[in-house]
Amino acid sequence: MAVESQGGRPLVLGLLLCVLGPVVSHAGKILLIPVDGSHWLSMLGAIQQLQQRGHEIVVLAPDASLYIRDGAFYTLKTYPVPFQREDVKESFVSLGHNVFENDSFLQRVIKTYKKIKKDSAMLLSGCSHLLHNKELMASLAESSFDVMLTDPFLPCSPIVAQYLSLPTVFFLHALPCSLEFEATQCPNPFSYVPRPLSSHSDHMTFLQRVKNMLIAFSQNFLCDVVYSPYATLASEFLQREVTVQDLLSSASVWLFRSDFVKDYPRPIMPNMVFVGGINCLHQNPLSQEFEAYINASGEHGIVVFSLGSMVSEIPEKKAMAIADALGKIPQTVLWRYTGTRPSNLANNTILVKWLPQNDLLGHPMTRAFITHAGSHGVYESICNGVPMVMMPLFGDQMDNAKRMETKGAGVTLNVLEMTSEDLENALKAVINDKSYKENIMRLSSLHKDRPVEPLDLAVFWVEFVMRHKGAPHLRPAAHDLTWYQYHSLDVIGFLLAVVLTVAFITFKCCAYGYRKCLGKKGRVKKAHKSKTH
Protein backbone atom coordinates (compact mmCIF):
# COMPACT_ATOMS: atom_id res chain seq x y z
CA MET A 1 0.00 0.00 0.00
CA ALA A 2 2.83 2.39 0.86
CA VAL A 3 4.56 1.68 -2.42
CA GLU A 4 1.34 2.33 -4.35
CA SER A 5 0.83 5.59 -2.43
CA GLN A 6 4.33 6.85 -3.14
CA GLY A 7 4.10 5.85 -6.78
CA GLY A 8 0.84 7.75 -7.12
CA ARG A 9 2.25 11.05 -5.88
CA PRO A 10 4.22 11.91 -9.03
CA LEU A 11 1.16 11.02 -11.09
CA VAL A 12 -1.06 13.35 -9.06
CA LEU A 13 1.59 16.08 -9.19
CA GLY A 14 1.90 15.68 -12.94
CA LEU A 15 -1.85 15.92 -13.40
CA LEU A 16 -1.96 19.08 -11.28
CA LEU A 17 0.81 20.66 -13.34
CA CYS A 18 -1.05 19.78 -16.53
CA VAL A 19 -4.24 21.35 -15.24
CA LEU A 20 -2.80 24.41 -13.51
CA GLY A 21 0.29 25.18 -15.54
CA PRO A 22 0.38 26.89 -18.94
CA VAL A 23 1.15 24.02 -21.31
CA VAL A 24 2.30 25.21 -24.74
CA SER A 25 3.32 22.69 -27.36
CA HIS A 26 4.87 25.38 -29.53
CA ALA A 27 5.88 28.90 -28.55
CA GLY A 28 4.86 30.95 -31.54
CA LYS A 29 5.39 34.41 -32.95
CA ILE A 30 2.36 36.66 -33.19
CA LEU A 31 2.04 39.84 -35.25
CA LEU A 32 -0.56 42.13 -33.71
CA ILE A 33 -1.94 45.14 -35.61
CA PRO A 34 -4.45 46.94 -33.38
CA VAL A 35 -6.79 49.91 -33.77
CA ASP A 36 -6.13 52.79 -31.38
CA GLY A 37 -8.41 53.70 -28.48
CA SER A 38 -10.72 51.28 -26.68
CA HIS A 39 -10.17 48.71 -29.44
CA TRP A 40 -6.54 48.44 -28.34
CA LEU A 41 -7.31 48.46 -24.62
CA SER A 42 -9.70 45.53 -25.07
CA MET A 43 -6.87 43.37 -26.46
CA LEU A 44 -4.42 43.84 -23.60
CA GLY A 45 -5.69 40.97 -21.46
CA ALA A 46 -5.41 38.47 -24.31
CA ILE A 47 -1.95 39.76 -25.27
CA GLN A 48 -0.67 39.41 -21.71
CA GLN A 49 -2.07 35.88 -21.41
CA LEU A 50 -0.48 34.85 -24.71
CA GLN A 51 2.88 36.25 -23.59
CA GLN A 52 2.64 34.36 -20.29
CA ARG A 53 2.14 31.18 -22.29
CA GLY A 54 5.49 31.68 -23.98
CA HIS A 55 4.54 33.39 -27.22
CA GLU A 56 6.47 36.32 -28.67
CA ILE A 57 4.23 39.24 -29.58
CA VAL A 58 5.15 42.09 -31.92
CA VAL A 59 2.74 45.03 -31.99
CA LEU A 60 2.79 47.13 -35.16
CA ALA A 61 1.33 50.64 -34.82
CA PRO A 62 1.69 54.16 -36.27
CA ASP A 63 4.04 56.50 -34.41
CA ALA A 64 1.13 58.92 -33.88
CA SER A 65 -0.89 56.48 -31.72
CA LEU A 66 -2.56 57.91 -28.63
CA TYR A 67 -2.88 54.80 -26.48
CA ILE A 68 -0.49 52.27 -28.04
CA ARG A 69 2.82 52.63 -26.21
CA ASP A 70 5.70 50.38 -25.16
CA GLY A 71 4.64 47.49 -22.93
CA ALA A 72 6.32 44.88 -20.76
CA PHE A 73 4.73 41.88 -22.49
CA TYR A 74 5.15 42.79 -26.16
CA THR A 75 7.60 44.40 -28.55
CA LEU A 76 6.36 47.60 -30.17
CA LYS A 77 7.30 48.48 -33.74
CA THR A 78 6.17 51.85 -35.04
CA TYR A 79 6.10 53.31 -38.53
CA PRO A 80 5.92 56.95 -39.64
CA VAL A 81 2.60 58.37 -40.82
CA PRO A 82 1.73 61.75 -42.42
CA PHE A 83 -0.15 63.03 -39.36
CA GLN A 84 0.68 63.86 -35.75
CA ARG A 85 -0.55 62.53 -32.41
CA GLU A 86 -2.36 65.85 -31.93
CA ASP A 87 -4.40 65.15 -35.08
CA VAL A 88 -5.52 61.80 -33.67
CA LYS A 89 -6.35 63.40 -30.33
CA GLU A 90 -8.35 66.14 -32.04
CA SER A 91 -10.32 63.48 -33.92
CA PHE A 92 -11.22 61.70 -30.65
CA VAL A 93 -12.03 64.92 -28.77
CA SER A 94 -14.18 66.38 -31.57
CA LEU A 95 -16.25 63.21 -31.60
CA GLY A 96 -17.07 63.73 -27.93
CA HIS A 97 -17.79 67.45 -28.39
CA ASN A 98 -20.08 66.98 -31.40
CA VAL A 99 -22.40 64.79 -29.35
CA PHE A 100 -23.64 67.74 -27.31
CA GLU A 101 -24.39 69.99 -30.30
CA ASN A 102 -28.17 70.18 -30.68
CA ASP A 103 -28.24 70.26 -34.50
CA SER A 104 -31.07 69.33 -36.82
CA PHE A 105 -31.15 65.84 -38.33
CA LEU A 106 -29.85 67.11 -41.68
CA GLN A 107 -27.02 69.05 -40.02
CA ARG A 108 -26.01 65.95 -38.05
CA VAL A 109 -25.98 63.84 -41.22
CA ILE A 110 -23.81 66.37 -43.08
CA LYS A 111 -21.42 66.80 -40.13
CA THR A 112 -21.13 63.06 -39.63
CA TYR A 113 -20.46 62.48 -43.33
CA LYS A 114 -17.75 65.17 -43.40
CA LYS A 115 -16.09 63.85 -40.24
CA ILE A 116 -16.13 60.27 -41.47
CA LYS A 117 -14.63 61.33 -44.77
CA LYS A 118 -11.92 63.42 -43.08
CA ASP A 119 -10.97 60.75 -40.53
CA SER A 120 -11.09 58.01 -43.16
CA ALA A 121 -8.70 59.94 -45.40
CA MET A 122 -6.26 60.36 -42.49
CA LEU A 123 -6.37 56.67 -41.57
CA LEU A 124 -6.09 55.59 -45.21
CA SER A 125 -2.95 57.70 -45.61
CA GLY A 126 -1.47 55.92 -42.58
CA CYS A 127 -2.27 52.55 -44.14
CA SER A 128 -0.69 53.59 -47.44
CA HIS A 129 2.50 54.68 -45.65
CA LEU A 130 2.67 51.30 -43.90
CA LEU A 131 2.22 49.27 -47.07
CA HIS A 132 4.74 51.32 -49.04
CA ASN A 133 7.35 51.18 -46.29
CA LYS A 134 9.50 48.63 -48.16
CA GLU A 135 12.09 48.26 -45.42
CA LEU A 136 9.48 47.54 -42.75
CA MET A 137 7.46 45.17 -44.94
CA ALA A 138 10.64 43.26 -45.83
CA SER A 139 11.49 43.03 -42.12
CA LEU A 140 8.02 41.65 -41.37
CA ALA A 141 8.34 39.09 -44.16
CA GLU A 142 11.66 37.88 -42.73
CA SER A 143 10.29 37.61 -39.17
CA SER A 144 8.46 34.32 -39.83
CA PHE A 145 5.30 35.09 -37.87
CA ASP A 146 2.91 32.21 -37.18
CA VAL A 147 -0.32 34.18 -37.01
CA MET A 148 -1.74 37.69 -37.12
CA LEU A 149 -4.10 38.90 -34.39
CA THR A 150 -5.88 42.09 -35.39
CA ASP A 151 -8.99 44.24 -35.19
CA PRO A 152 -10.42 44.51 -38.74
CA PHE A 153 -12.26 47.78 -38.04
CA LEU A 154 -9.68 49.26 -40.41
CA PRO A 155 -9.06 46.75 -43.24
CA CYS A 156 -5.37 47.65 -43.51
CA SER A 157 -4.16 44.73 -41.40
CA PRO A 158 -5.91 42.11 -43.60
CA ILE A 159 -3.93 43.53 -46.54
CA VAL A 160 -0.70 42.98 -44.60
CA ALA A 161 -1.86 39.47 -43.65
CA GLN A 162 -2.49 38.58 -47.29
CA TYR A 163 0.86 40.02 -48.34
CA LEU A 164 2.66 37.96 -45.67
CA SER A 165 0.42 34.89 -46.26
CA LEU A 166 -0.43 34.72 -42.56
CA PRO A 167 -3.45 32.97 -41.04
CA THR A 168 -5.48 35.62 -39.26
CA VAL A 169 -7.58 35.86 -36.12
CA PHE A 170 -9.90 38.86 -35.94
CA PHE A 171 -10.63 40.35 -32.50
CA LEU A 172 -13.53 42.81 -32.50
CA HIS A 173 -16.85 43.90 -31.09
CA ALA A 174 -18.58 44.56 -34.41
CA LEU A 175 -18.03 46.15 -37.82
CA PRO A 176 -20.00 48.98 -39.42
CA CYS A 177 -22.81 48.05 -41.80
CA SER A 178 -22.83 44.41 -40.63
CA LEU A 179 -19.72 43.73 -42.71
CA GLU A 180 -18.73 40.92 -40.37
CA PHE A 181 -21.80 38.94 -41.42
CA GLU A 182 -21.22 39.52 -45.12
CA ALA A 183 -17.58 38.49 -44.74
CA THR A 184 -18.45 35.27 -42.89
CA GLN A 185 -21.41 34.50 -45.19
CA CYS A 186 -23.58 34.44 -42.10
CA PRO A 187 -27.37 34.72 -42.62
CA ASN A 188 -28.51 38.17 -41.55
CA PRO A 189 -32.29 38.47 -42.05
CA PHE A 190 -33.92 41.90 -41.88
CA SER A 191 -36.99 40.43 -40.20
CA TYR A 192 -35.54 39.90 -36.72
CA VAL A 193 -31.88 40.99 -36.73
CA PRO A 194 -31.79 44.76 -36.06
CA ARG A 195 -29.22 46.67 -38.08
CA PRO A 196 -26.47 48.72 -36.37
CA LEU A 197 -27.61 52.18 -35.21
CA SER A 198 -31.29 51.23 -35.61
CA SER A 199 -31.94 51.07 -31.83
CA HIS A 200 -34.48 48.31 -32.51
CA SER A 201 -35.04 45.15 -30.55
CA ASP A 202 -35.34 41.74 -32.21
CA HIS A 203 -39.15 42.01 -32.02
CA MET A 204 -39.94 44.67 -34.61
CA THR A 205 -43.23 46.06 -35.87
CA PHE A 206 -43.91 46.19 -39.61
CA LEU A 207 -42.75 49.81 -39.86
CA GLN A 208 -39.62 49.03 -37.84
CA ARG A 209 -38.82 46.20 -40.27
CA VAL A 210 -39.24 48.65 -43.14
CA LYS A 211 -36.87 51.06 -41.39
CA ASN A 212 -34.47 48.20 -40.66
CA MET A 213 -34.23 47.37 -44.37
CA LEU A 214 -33.82 51.01 -45.40
CA ILE A 215 -31.05 51.48 -42.82
CA ALA A 216 -29.21 48.48 -44.25
CA PHE A 217 -29.33 49.94 -47.77
CA SER A 218 -28.24 53.42 -46.63
CA GLN A 219 -25.37 52.01 -44.56
CA ASN A 220 -24.03 50.26 -47.65
CA PHE A 221 -23.53 53.69 -49.23
CA LEU A 222 -21.75 55.03 -46.13
CA CYS A 223 -19.49 52.00 -45.88
CA ASP A 224 -18.64 52.31 -49.55
CA VAL A 225 -17.32 55.82 -48.84
CA VAL A 226 -15.14 54.54 -45.98
CA TYR A 227 -13.98 51.15 -47.21
CA SER A 228 -13.84 51.22 -51.03
CA PRO A 229 -10.50 53.16 -51.02
CA TYR A 230 -8.98 50.23 -49.09
CA ALA A 231 -10.05 47.87 -51.87
CA THR A 232 -8.31 50.12 -54.41
CA LEU A 233 -5.19 50.30 -52.25
CA ALA A 234 -5.18 46.53 -51.69
CA SER A 235 -5.62 45.79 -55.40
CA GLU A 236 -2.70 48.06 -56.23
CA PHE A 237 -0.46 46.67 -53.48
CA LEU A 238 -1.28 42.97 -53.91
CA GLN A 239 -1.36 43.35 -57.72
CA ARG A 240 -4.68 41.57 -58.12
CA GLU A 241 -8.32 42.60 -57.99
CA VAL A 242 -9.44 42.56 -54.35
CA THR A 243 -12.64 43.67 -52.62
CA VAL A 244 -13.05 44.56 -48.95
CA GLN A 245 -15.17 41.44 -48.52
CA ASP A 246 -12.28 39.38 -49.94
CA LEU A 247 -9.95 40.91 -47.35
CA LEU A 248 -12.31 40.30 -44.44
CA SER A 249 -13.40 36.81 -45.50
CA SER A 250 -9.79 35.61 -45.36
CA ALA A 251 -9.89 35.41 -41.54
CA SER A 252 -9.54 31.95 -40.03
CA VAL A 253 -11.43 32.76 -36.81
CA TRP A 254 -13.47 35.74 -35.63
CA LEU A 255 -13.35 36.50 -31.89
CA PHE A 256 -16.34 38.68 -31.01
CA ARG A 257 -16.35 40.65 -27.76
CA SER A 258 -20.03 39.92 -27.25
CA ASP A 259 -22.40 37.11 -26.31
CA PHE A 260 -26.09 36.36 -26.30
CA VAL A 261 -26.57 37.63 -22.76
CA LYS A 262 -26.09 41.15 -24.10
CA ASP A 263 -27.01 40.65 -27.76
CA TYR A 264 -30.13 39.21 -29.34
CA PRO A 265 -30.06 35.58 -30.55
CA ARG A 266 -29.18 35.33 -34.24
CA PRO A 267 -27.53 32.92 -36.70
CA ILE A 268 -23.78 32.38 -36.42
CA MET A 269 -21.11 30.52 -38.42
CA PRO A 270 -18.59 27.86 -37.28
CA ASN A 271 -15.62 30.26 -37.20
CA MET A 272 -17.43 32.88 -35.08
CA VAL A 273 -16.39 32.63 -31.41
CA PHE A 274 -17.91 34.80 -28.67
CA VAL A 275 -15.70 36.13 -25.86
CA GLY A 276 -17.91 38.82 -24.35
CA GLY A 277 -16.76 39.92 -20.90
CA ILE A 278 -13.11 39.20 -21.66
CA ASN A 279 -12.07 42.45 -19.96
CA CYS A 280 -13.84 42.08 -16.64
CA LEU A 281 -12.52 38.82 -15.24
CA HIS A 282 -9.95 40.06 -12.75
CA GLN A 283 -10.37 42.70 -10.06
CA ASN A 284 -7.63 44.50 -8.21
CA PRO A 285 -7.78 45.86 -4.64
CA LEU A 286 -8.92 49.48 -4.46
CA SER A 287 -6.48 52.20 -3.50
CA GLN A 288 -6.78 53.86 -0.10
CA GLU A 289 -8.30 56.93 -1.78
CA PHE A 290 -11.25 55.04 -3.27
CA GLU A 291 -11.67 52.82 -0.21
CA ALA A 292 -12.00 55.99 1.85
CA TYR A 293 -14.71 57.33 -0.49
CA ILE A 294 -16.68 54.09 -0.17
CA ASN A 295 -16.31 53.88 3.61
CA ALA A 296 -17.50 57.47 3.96
CA SER A 297 -20.64 56.73 1.91
CA GLY A 298 -22.22 54.81 4.79
CA GLU A 299 -25.16 52.49 4.21
CA HIS A 300 -26.26 54.30 1.05
CA GLY A 301 -23.22 53.20 -0.95
CA ILE A 302 -21.85 54.76 -4.13
CA VAL A 303 -22.77 55.47 -7.74
CA VAL A 304 -20.06 55.20 -10.41
CA PHE A 305 -20.32 57.76 -13.25
CA SER A 306 -18.21 57.68 -16.41
CA LEU A 307 -18.97 58.69 -20.00
CA GLY A 308 -15.73 57.27 -21.38
CA SER A 309 -12.41 58.79 -22.34
CA MET A 310 -13.74 60.67 -25.38
CA VAL A 311 -15.91 63.04 -23.33
CA SER A 312 -13.53 65.42 -21.60
CA GLU A 313 -15.89 68.41 -21.43
CA ILE A 314 -19.68 68.79 -21.16
CA PRO A 315 -21.45 72.10 -21.95
CA GLU A 316 -21.88 74.15 -18.77
CA LYS A 317 -25.69 74.09 -18.76
CA LYS A 318 -25.81 70.32 -19.21
CA ALA A 319 -23.07 69.72 -16.62
CA MET A 320 -24.98 71.81 -14.07
CA ALA A 321 -28.21 69.88 -14.77
CA ILE A 322 -26.34 66.62 -14.18
CA ALA A 323 -24.70 67.95 -11.01
CA ASP A 324 -28.09 69.10 -9.71
CA ALA A 325 -29.57 65.61 -10.17
CA LEU A 326 -26.60 63.89 -8.54
CA GLY A 327 -26.95 66.12 -5.49
CA LYS A 328 -30.50 64.87 -4.88
CA ILE A 329 -29.64 61.24 -4.17
CA PRO A 330 -28.22 60.00 -0.85
CA GLN A 331 -25.43 57.97 -2.46
CA THR A 332 -21.87 59.22 -2.93
CA VAL A 333 -21.18 59.73 -6.64
CA LEU A 334 -17.71 59.13 -8.08
CA TRP A 335 -17.75 61.06 -11.37
CA ARG A 336 -14.89 60.60 -13.82
CA TYR A 337 -14.74 64.06 -15.38
CA THR A 338 -11.85 66.22 -16.55
CA GLY A 339 -13.86 69.27 -17.61
CA THR A 340 -14.70 72.46 -15.76
CA ARG A 341 -16.13 71.81 -12.29
CA PRO A 342 -19.88 72.66 -12.21
CA SER A 343 -20.52 75.54 -9.82
CA ASN A 344 -23.47 73.71 -8.23
CA LEU A 345 -21.62 70.45 -7.55
CA ALA A 346 -23.02 68.90 -4.36
CA ASN A 347 -20.98 67.58 -1.44
CA ASN A 348 -21.92 63.98 -2.28
CA THR A 349 -20.30 64.20 -5.74
CA ILE A 350 -16.56 63.68 -6.13
CA LEU A 351 -14.83 64.53 -9.41
CA VAL A 352 -11.89 62.31 -10.36
CA LYS A 353 -9.71 62.34 -13.49
CA TRP A 354 -9.55 58.55 -13.51
CA LEU A 355 -11.24 55.72 -11.69
CA PRO A 356 -10.78 51.92 -11.55
CA GLN A 357 -14.15 51.28 -13.14
CA ASN A 358 -14.32 47.48 -13.02
CA ASP A 359 -12.90 47.34 -9.49
CA LEU A 360 -15.47 49.86 -8.25
CA LEU A 361 -18.35 48.10 -9.99
CA GLY A 362 -17.28 44.89 -8.29
CA HIS A 363 -17.57 46.44 -4.82
CA PRO A 364 -20.71 45.36 -2.90
CA MET A 365 -21.46 49.00 -1.94
CA THR A 366 -21.92 50.09 -5.58
CA ARG A 367 -25.61 50.76 -6.22
CA ALA A 368 -25.71 52.01 -9.82
CA PHE A 369 -23.57 52.83 -12.84
CA ILE A 370 -24.11 55.92 -15.00
CA THR A 371 -22.55 55.06 -18.35
CA HIS A 372 -22.44 55.96 -22.03
CA ALA A 373 -23.20 52.27 -22.73
CA GLY A 374 -19.91 51.43 -24.40
CA SER A 375 -19.41 47.69 -24.77
CA HIS A 376 -16.66 47.60 -22.10
CA GLY A 377 -18.79 49.34 -19.50
CA VAL A 378 -21.89 47.30 -20.28
CA TYR A 379 -20.01 44.02 -19.84
CA GLU A 380 -18.39 45.22 -16.62
CA SER A 381 -21.86 46.08 -15.37
CA ILE A 382 -23.15 42.63 -16.35
CA CYS A 383 -20.17 40.83 -14.80
CA ASN A 384 -20.59 42.67 -11.52
CA GLY A 385 -24.40 42.82 -11.46
CA VAL A 386 -24.80 46.61 -11.29
CA PRO A 387 -27.92 48.23 -12.85
CA MET A 388 -27.32 51.11 -15.24
CA VAL A 389 -28.51 54.57 -16.16
CA MET A 390 -27.40 54.82 -19.78
CA MET A 391 -26.64 57.98 -21.76
CA PRO A 392 -25.55 56.67 -25.19
CA LEU A 393 -23.55 59.20 -27.18
CA PHE A 394 -22.63 57.71 -30.57
CA GLY A 395 -21.94 54.55 -32.55
CA ASP A 396 -23.05 51.20 -31.14
CA GLN A 397 -23.81 52.72 -27.74
CA MET A 398 -27.43 53.37 -28.74
CA ASP A 399 -27.85 49.71 -29.65
CA ASN A 400 -26.14 48.54 -26.44
CA ALA A 401 -28.45 50.73 -24.37
CA LYS A 402 -31.54 49.43 -26.19
CA ARG A 403 -30.49 45.83 -25.54
CA MET A 404 -29.96 46.42 -21.82
CA GLU A 405 -33.17 48.39 -21.45
CA THR A 406 -35.10 45.63 -23.27
CA LYS A 407 -33.70 43.12 -20.77
CA GLY A 408 -34.74 45.30 -17.82
CA ALA A 409 -31.17 45.97 -16.67
CA GLY A 410 -31.25 49.75 -16.84
CA VAL A 411 -32.85 52.99 -17.99
CA THR A 412 -31.86 54.92 -21.13
CA LEU A 413 -31.81 58.73 -21.28
CA ASN A 414 -31.33 61.03 -24.27
CA VAL A 415 -28.34 63.07 -23.18
CA LEU A 416 -29.43 66.08 -25.28
CA GLU A 417 -33.05 66.18 -24.14
CA MET A 418 -32.88 64.92 -20.55
CA THR A 419 -33.50 67.27 -17.65
CA SER A 420 -32.13 67.20 -14.13
CA GLU A 421 -35.40 65.64 -13.00
CA ASP A 422 -35.13 62.89 -15.64
CA LEU A 423 -31.70 61.86 -14.39
CA GLU A 424 -32.80 62.02 -10.75
CA ASN A 425 -35.84 59.82 -11.44
CA ALA A 426 -33.78 57.34 -13.46
CA LEU A 427 -31.21 56.99 -10.68
CA LYS A 428 -33.84 56.53 -8.00
CA ALA A 429 -35.58 53.93 -10.18
CA VAL A 430 -32.55 51.69 -10.78
CA ILE A 431 -31.41 52.03 -7.14
CA ASN A 432 -34.76 51.56 -5.39
CA ASP A 433 -36.71 49.34 -7.80
CA LYS A 434 -35.50 45.81 -7.04
CA SER A 435 -36.44 44.52 -10.50
CA TYR A 436 -33.43 46.26 -12.12
CA LYS A 437 -31.02 44.66 -9.67
CA GLU A 438 -32.71 41.27 -10.07
CA ASN A 439 -32.57 41.48 -13.86
CA ILE A 440 -28.90 42.46 -14.02
CA MET A 441 -28.04 39.72 -11.50
CA ARG A 442 -29.90 37.20 -13.67
CA LEU A 443 -27.89 38.36 -16.71
CA SER A 444 -24.70 38.15 -14.65
CA SER A 445 -25.53 34.59 -13.62
CA LEU A 446 -26.20 33.58 -17.23
CA HIS A 447 -23.04 35.28 -18.44
CA LYS A 448 -20.82 33.52 -15.90
CA ASP A 449 -22.40 30.08 -16.36
CA ARG A 450 -20.06 28.75 -19.08
CA PRO A 451 -17.54 25.93 -19.40
CA VAL A 452 -14.60 28.14 -20.42
CA GLU A 453 -13.70 31.71 -19.44
CA PRO A 454 -13.69 34.19 -22.36
CA LEU A 455 -9.98 34.96 -21.98
CA ASP A 456 -9.04 31.27 -22.06
CA LEU A 457 -11.30 30.72 -25.06
CA ALA A 458 -9.69 33.59 -26.99
CA VAL A 459 -6.19 32.32 -26.22
CA PHE A 460 -7.17 28.79 -27.24
CA TRP A 461 -8.36 29.87 -30.68
CA VAL A 462 -5.28 31.99 -31.37
CA GLU A 463 -3.10 29.00 -30.51
CA PHE A 464 -5.39 26.69 -32.51
CA VAL A 465 -4.89 28.78 -35.65
CA MET A 466 -1.14 28.82 -34.99
CA ARG A 467 -0.98 25.04 -34.59
CA HIS A 468 -3.04 24.24 -37.68
CA LYS A 469 -1.94 27.15 -39.92
CA GLY A 470 -5.50 28.37 -40.12
CA ALA A 471 -8.95 26.80 -39.82
CA PRO A 472 -10.08 25.94 -43.37
CA HIS A 473 -12.39 23.21 -42.05
CA LEU A 474 -14.57 25.95 -40.51
CA ARG A 475 -14.90 27.87 -43.77
CA PRO A 476 -18.32 27.29 -45.40
CA ALA A 477 -18.63 26.59 -49.13
CA ALA A 478 -20.80 29.71 -49.38
CA HIS A 479 -17.57 31.67 -49.91
CA ASP A 480 -17.08 29.86 -53.23
CA LEU A 481 -20.53 30.63 -54.64
CA THR A 482 -21.67 33.58 -56.70
CA TRP A 483 -24.48 35.71 -55.29
CA TYR A 484 -27.07 34.07 -57.55
CA GLN A 485 -25.82 30.58 -56.65
CA TYR A 486 -25.94 31.43 -52.93
CA HIS A 487 -29.60 32.42 -53.23
CA SER A 488 -30.28 29.47 -55.60
CA LEU A 489 -31.57 31.88 -58.25
CA ASP A 490 -30.09 29.71 -61.00
CA VAL A 491 -31.88 26.64 -59.61
CA ILE A 492 -35.13 28.57 -59.22
CA GLY A 493 -34.75 29.89 -62.77
CA PHE A 494 -34.10 26.39 -64.10
CA LEU A 495 -37.07 24.86 -62.25
CA LEU A 496 -39.28 27.74 -63.36
CA ALA A 497 -38.17 27.20 -66.96
CA VAL A 498 -38.95 23.46 -66.66
CA VAL A 499 -42.41 24.17 -65.21
CA LEU A 500 -43.15 26.76 -67.89
CA THR A 501 -41.89 24.44 -70.62
CA VAL A 502 -44.02 21.54 -69.36
CA ALA A 503 -47.00 23.87 -69.01
CA PHE A 504 -46.44 25.22 -72.54
CA ILE A 505 -46.13 21.72 -74.05
CA THR A 506 -49.19 20.55 -72.11
CA PHE A 507 -51.16 23.58 -73.30
CA LYS A 508 -50.08 23.00 -76.92
CA CYS A 509 -50.98 19.32 -76.73
CA CYS A 510 -54.38 20.12 -75.25
CA ALA A 511 -54.99 22.80 -77.85
CA TYR A 512 -53.98 20.44 -80.64
CA GLY A 513 -56.21 17.66 -79.27
CA TYR A 514 -59.06 20.11 -78.83
CA ARG A 515 -58.74 21.28 -82.43
CA LYS A 516 -58.54 17.71 -83.68
CA CYS A 517 -61.56 16.71 -81.63
CA LEU A 518 -63.52 19.79 -82.72
CA GLY A 519 -62.59 19.17 -86.37
CA LYS A 520 -63.73 15.55 -86.19
CA LYS A 521 -67.07 16.53 -84.67
CA GLY A 522 -67.51 19.09 -87.43
CA ARG A 523 -66.93 16.50 -90.14
CA VAL A 524 -69.35 14.04 -88.50
CA LYS A 525 -72.07 16.69 -88.30
CA LYS A 526 -71.47 17.62 -91.93
CA ALA A 527 -71.73 13.99 -93.06
CA HIS A 528 -74.92 13.52 -91.00
CA LYS A 529 -76.54 16.56 -92.59
CA SER A 530 -75.69 15.39 -96.11
CA LYS A 531 -77.29 11.99 -95.42
CA THR A 532 -80.55 13.49 -94.17
CA HIS A 533 -80.85 15.60 -97.30
UniProtKB/Swiss-Prot annotation:
<feature type="glycosylation site" description="N-linked (GlcNAc...) asparagine">
    <location>
        <position position="347"/>
    </location>
</feature>
<dbReference type="GO" id="GO:0001972">
    <property type="term" value="F:retinoic acid binding"/>
</dbReference>
<dbReference type="GO" id="GO:0019899">
    <property type="term" value="F:enzyme binding"/>
</dbReference>
<keyword id="KW-0325">Glycoprotein</keyword>
<dbReference type="GO" id="GO:0005886">
    <property type="term" value="C:plasma membrane"/>
</dbReference>
<dbReference type="GO" id="GO:0005496">
    <property type="term" value="F:steroid binding"/>
</dbReference>
<protein>
    <recommendedName>
        <fullName>UDP-glucuronosyltransferase 1A1</fullName>
        <ecNumber>2.4.1.17</ecNumber>
    </recommendedName>
</protein>
<feature type="transmembrane region" description="Helical">
    <location>
        <begin position="491"/>
        <end position="507"/>
    </location>
</feature>
<dbReference type="InterPro" id="IPR035595">
    <property type="entry name" value="UDP_glycos_trans_CS"/>
</dbReference>
<dbReference type="GO" id="GO:0051552">
    <property type="term" value="P:flavone metabolic process"/>
</dbReference>
<dbReference type="GO" id="GO:0048471">
    <property type="term" value="C:perinuclear region of cytoplasm"/>
</dbReference>
<keyword id="KW-1133">Transmembrane helix</keyword>
<keyword id="KW-0963">Cytoplasm</keyword>
<dbReference type="GO" id="GO:0034663">
    <property type="term" value="C:endoplasmic reticulum chaperone complex"/>
</dbReference>
<dbReference type="InterPro" id="IPR002213">
    <property type="entry name" value="UDP_glucos_trans"/>
</dbReference>
<dbReference type="GO" id="GO:0045939">
    <property type="term" value="P:negative regulation of steroid metabolic process"/>
</dbReference>
<dbReference type="GO" id="GO:0042573">
    <property type="term" value="P:retinoic acid metabolic process"/>
</dbReference>
<dbReference type="GO" id="GO:0008202">
    <property type="term" value="P:steroid metabolic process"/>
</dbReference>
<dbReference type="GO" id="GO:0006789">
    <property type="term" value="P:bilirubin conjugation"/>
</dbReference>
<feature type="glycosylation site" description="N-linked (GlcNAc...) asparagine">
    <location>
        <position position="102"/>
    </location>
</feature>
<keyword id="KW-0328">Glycosyltransferase</keyword>
<dbReference type="GO" id="GO:0009812">
    <property type="term" value="P:flavonoid metabolic process"/>
</dbReference>
<keyword id="KW-0225">Disease variant</keyword>
<feature type="glycosylation site" description="N-linked (GlcNAc...) asparagine">
    <location>
        <position position="295"/>
    </location>
</feature>
<comment type="similarity">
    <text>Belongs to the UDP-glycosyltransferase family.</text>
</comment>
<dbReference type="GO" id="GO:0005789">
    <property type="term" value="C:endoplasmic reticulum membrane"/>
</dbReference>
<dbReference type="GO" id="GO:0004857">
    <property type="term" value="F:enzyme inhibitor activity"/>
</dbReference>
<dbReference type="GO" id="GO:0046982">
    <property type="term" value="F:protein heterodimerization activity"/>
</dbReference>
<feature type="signal peptide">
    <location>
        <begin position="1"/>
        <end position="25"/>
    </location>
</feature>
<dbReference type="GO" id="GO:0045922">
    <property type="term" value="P:negative regulation of fatty acid metabolic process"/>
</dbReference>
<keyword id="KW-0732">Signal</keyword>
<dbReference type="GO" id="GO:0005783">
    <property type="term" value="C:endoplasmic reticulum"/>
</dbReference>
<comment type="subunit">
    <text>Homodimer. Homooligomer. Interacts with UGT1A3, UGT1A4, UGT1A6, UGT1A7, UGT1A8, UGT1A9 and UGT1A10 to form heterodimers. Isoform 1 interacts with isoform 2/i2 suggesting that oligomerization is involved in negative regulation of transferase activity by isoform 2. Isoform 1 also interacts with respective i2 isoforms of UGT1A3, UGT1A4, UGT1A6, UGT1A7, UGT1A8, UGT1A9 and UGT1A10.</text>
</comment>
<dbReference type="GO" id="GO:0008210">
    <property type="term" value="P:estrogen metabolic process"/>
</dbReference>
<dbReference type="GO" id="GO:0015020">
    <property type="term" value="F:glucuronosyltransferase activity"/>
</dbReference>
<keyword id="KW-0443">Lipid metabolism</keyword>
<dbReference type="Pfam" id="PF00201">
    <property type="entry name" value="UDPGT"/>
</dbReference>
<keyword id="KW-0812">Transmembrane</keyword>
<keyword id="KW-0256">Endoplasmic reticulum</keyword>
<keyword id="KW-0472">Membrane</keyword>
<keyword id="KW-0808">Transferase</keyword>
<dbReference type="InterPro" id="IPR050271">
    <property type="entry name" value="UDP-glycosyltransferase"/>
</dbReference>
